[in-house]
């Protein structure tokens, strides 16, 4: 089983699909990585040689932010917005939608379960 960026890749999947199990690598990034390392995208993960795995690992470590580093960068970006006090930061602080969606109705994913208000009837 190949272990790249702290993730055990699934054995019986094509390597182009298996790489997408790493947080921060999608289909297009996986294809670019395989092209840069000259690994066939149709190769199964369990058929990779140690050299292929080390080339993939080096390419990912050198050029792409993945897993913990990426999560940390995203959370730091959100924290920076909140510290600035800009509109987007305030929306993050209040737990409301950030990108202009309506909140009179809907927005339940961000706001959480509905809290009923006493005496509110039509």
Swiss-Prot record:
GO biological process: translation
Stretches the record annotates as Disordered: 97-122
A single MF term (Gene Ontology): rRNA binding
Keyword Ribosomal protein: yes
GO CC term, one of those recorded: small ribosomal subunit
PROSITE patterns hit by this protein: RIBOSOMAL_S13_1, RIBOSOMAL_S13_2
Gene3D superfamilies per record: 1.10.8.50, 30s ribosomal protein s13, domain 2 (4.10.910.10)
Pfam families: Ribosomal_S13
Keywords: Ribonucleoprotein, Ribosomal protein, RNA-binding, rRNA-binding, tRNA-binding
InterPro entries tied to this protein: Rbsml_uS13_C, Ribosomal_uS13, Ribosomal_uS13-like_H2TH, Ribosomal_uS13_bac-type, Ribosomal_uS13_CS
Keyword field contains Magnesium: no
UniProt record similarity statement: Belongs to the universal ribosomal protein uS13 family.
Subunit architecture: Part of the 30S ribosomal subunit. Forms a loose heterodimer with protein S19. Forms two bridges to the 50S subunit in the 70S ribosome.
Purpose of the protein: Located at the top of the head of the 30S subunit, it contacts several helices of the 16S rRNA. In the 70S ribosome it contacts the 23S rRNA (bridge B1a) and protein L5 of the 50S subunit (bridge B1b), connecting the 2 subunits; these bridges are implicated in subunit movement. Contacts the tRNAs in the A and P-sites.
Name used for this protein in its record: Small ribosomal subunit protein uS13
């Amino acid at each position: 089983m190949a272990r790249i960026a702290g993730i055990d890749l699934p054995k019986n999947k094509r390597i182009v699909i298996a790489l997408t199990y790493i947080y921060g690598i999608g289909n297009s990034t996986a294809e670019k990585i395989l092209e840069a390392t000259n690994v066939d995208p149709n190769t199964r993960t369990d058929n990779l040689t140690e050299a292929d795995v080390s080339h993939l690992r080096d390419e990912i470590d050198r050029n792409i932010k993945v897993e913990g580093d990426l999560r940390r960068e995203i959370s730091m970006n959100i924290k920076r917005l909140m510290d600035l006090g800009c509109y987007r930061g305030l929306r993050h602080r209040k737990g409301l939608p950030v990108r202009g969606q309506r909140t009179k109705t809907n927005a339940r994913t961000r706001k959480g379960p509905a809290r009923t208000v006493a005496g509110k009837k039509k």
